[in-house]
Regions:
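N-terminal transmembrane hairpin
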Residues: 29-33
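NAD(P)-dependent Rossmann-like dehydrogenase/reductase catalytic/cofactor-binding core
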Residues: 144-218
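Single conserved hydrophobic/aromatic residue that forms the stacking wall/gate
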Residues: 1-12
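Internal alpha-helical scaffold of NAD(P)-dependent oxidoreductase catalytic cores
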Residues: 48-52, 67-159
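Rossmann-fold NAD(P)-binding glycine/threonine-rich loop
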Residues: 34-63
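Short, conserved loop/helix-junction motifs that constitute active-site signature segments
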Residues: 21-26, 45-50, 71
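Flavin (primarily FAD) binding-site architecture
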Residues: 13-20
Length: 218
């Protein structure tokens, strides 16, 4: 039997476990869907109950609790937990057509951080772009409409070809003058963000263009 705690905050998962652990759990598979929490952290002492704990995390942004589940068939699932029955848990999702990968408990937090950067922090960057567009006279709706082809096209290219082959723009070209103009039109906080992101872009650009001199941008 597979029992799961879905859609609960990490603190509440522990509370649910505290209510469950004195039940008859022999041979049960207990699963949670947290990205950052390991099975051992969520279900302390589960081995004493004769049960097996697993973290089953979909790499998927659930932005709408009523409709997001319809797209879960495309999600990549990352599983962590007791190795004894791990393949049985994976088989559930393999049979549904989902790709599955195993991860060690020690890597859960960094893995979840990677997912958050890709999903949540991208939203923050897009908001920064929308704010700049509005300073140029766009309203938010028209700015979003104007930027949509860039956003969607770029993400599609990255998904198909990776970041190195998808990189374009003034940093990739080592266009120092344009980068300087960009910095001059930003406030101090925006400049900090631009510089930090540009450092990452430079490292990608060096992979794409090994012979190009990025020294003046560093």
């Amino acid at each position: 039997d597979v029992l799961g705690s879905r859609g609960l905050g990490d603190v509440y998962k522990r509370q649910v476990w505290n209510q469950m652990k004195d039940m008859s759990l022999e041979g049960k598979f207990i699963c949670h869907c947290s990205g950052a929490l390991s099975a051992g952290d969520a279900f302390p002492g589960i081995d004493k109950c004769g049960a097996f704990g697993y973290s089953v995390h979909p790499l998927f942004a659930v932005s709408d609790k009523y409709n997001s589940y319809k797209e879960l068939s495309h999600a990549y699932f990352v599983i962590e937990g007791d190795e004894k029955h791990r393949e049985e848990i994976a088989g559930i999702f393999n049979n549904l057509g989902n790709e599955v990968r195993y991860i060690a408990a020690k890597d859960k937090v960094k893995y979840h951080c990677a997912a958050a950067v890709c999903s949540n922090h991208v939203v923050a960057l897009i908001q920064e772009s929308l704010d700049l567009m509005q300073e140029c006279g766009f309203d938010e709706e028209s700015a979003l409409k104007a930027l949509a082809p860039i956003m969607l096209g770029n993400m599609q290219h990255i998904a198909e070809r990776g970041t190195v082959n998808s990189l374009t723009g003034p940093v990739e070209r080592a266009d120092v003058k344009t980068v300087e103009k960009h910095l001059n039109c930003l406030d101090e906080k925006q400049q900090m963000l631009y510089r930090l992101l540009s450092e990452v872009l430079i490292s990608i650009g060096e992979k794409k263009n090994p012979g190009r001199d990025y020294g003046r941008l560093k």
